[in-house]
Amino acid sequence: MKIAILYREEREKEGKFLKEKISKEHEVIEFGEANAPGRVTADLIVVVGGDGTVLKAAKKAADGTPMVGFKAGRLGFLTSYTLDEIDRFLEDLRNWNFREETRWFIQIESELGNHLALNDVTLERDLSGKMVEIEVEVEHHSSMWFFADGVVISTPTGSTAYSLSIGGPIIFPECEVLEISPIAPQFFLTRSVVIPSNFKVVVESQRDINMLVDGVLTGKTKRIEVKKSRRYVRILRPPEYDYVTVIRDKLGYGRRIE
């Protein structure tokens, strides 16, 4: 099997450790930083880092490429193994003993160009700026208006990222939906809405505000169009992986009080 290993820039040592182990059984055809430019074509991409590293690596992957993450960051929703579990991973790889999750991208079109996001796209004001009136038009429906600091449009993958911190729901990865979450809205009852993923969303503000794609500032714009992309990656998990256990252990959600 031809494998690419991509790592966070300060995790080269951990990457070399995995390369040494993996290369005993498979051909490592690429080894480098996840944020380096260029596409990666391999049978499997191994990522060393946290969720941010996985997001960068996913955009370099060809459609449908399986990816597996080794945790070397903080929360690690998109990582599946620890470095200590390398032998366990190799055994799972020999037998292809994985659970697979399909994680799809959203496509964002604006005057800044076309972008892909696995987590979310955010339009928000500068810290020193005033609140902004934002119009959100969902395909086949009339517009919604928010007077807020901004708005986040996220995938199910991104529901445990920025959207969660501003009161959005946790969405299981298998759900085919998009989440629209206003940031610090003026009206308390203005909450997140969840829509079918095949609906296009147009967001327009009264003035130029910051656009962030997967947390990375790309510039300022007034208008974006967001829709589900055809691009996707496959995240490999150990066979016993359970999403509820993950959100309970990492977020404390649904934890039993003793």
From Swiss-Prot:
Active site: D51
Protein's name in the database: NAD kinase
Necessary cofactors: a divalent metal cation
NCBIfam families: PRK14075.1 (NF010677)
Entry function: Involved in the regulation of the intracellular balance of NAD and NADP, and is a key enzyme in the biosynthesis of NADP. Catalyzes specifically the phosphorylation on 2'-hydroxyl of the adenosine moiety of NAD to yield NADP.
UniProt-annotated binding residues for NAD(+): D51, G52, K56, N119, D120, K130, D149, T160, A161, Y162, S163, L164, S165, A184
Gene3D superfamilies: Probable inorganic polyphosphate/atp-NAD kinase, domain 1 (3.40.50.10330), Probable inorganic polyphosphate/atp-NAD kinase, domain 2 (2.60.200.30)
Pfam families attached to this UniProt entry: NAD_kinase, NAD_kinase_C
GO annotation terms (biological process): NAD metabolic process; NADP biosynthetic process
SUPFAM superfamilies: NAD kinase/diacylglycerol kinase-like (SSF111331)
Similarity comment: family membership: Belongs to the NAD kinase family.
UniProt enzyme class: transferase
Superkingdom field: Bacteria
Entry EC number(s): 2.7.1.23
InterPro entries registered for this protein in UniProt: ATP-NAD_kinase_N, ATP-NAD_kinase_PpnK-typ_C, NAD/diacylglycerol_kinase_sf, NADK
Gene Ontology MF terms: ATP binding; metal ion binding; NAD binding; NAD+ kinase activity
Gene, per the UniProt record: nadK
Main localisation: cytoplasm
Catalytic activity: NAD(+) + ATP = ADP + NADP(+) + H(+)
Keywords (A to Z) from UniProt: ATP-binding, Cytoplasm, Kinase, NAD, NADP, Nucleotide-binding, Transferase
Protein location: Cytoplasm
Native organism: Thermotoga petrophila (strain ATCC BAA-488 / DSM 13995 / JCM 10881 / RKU-1)
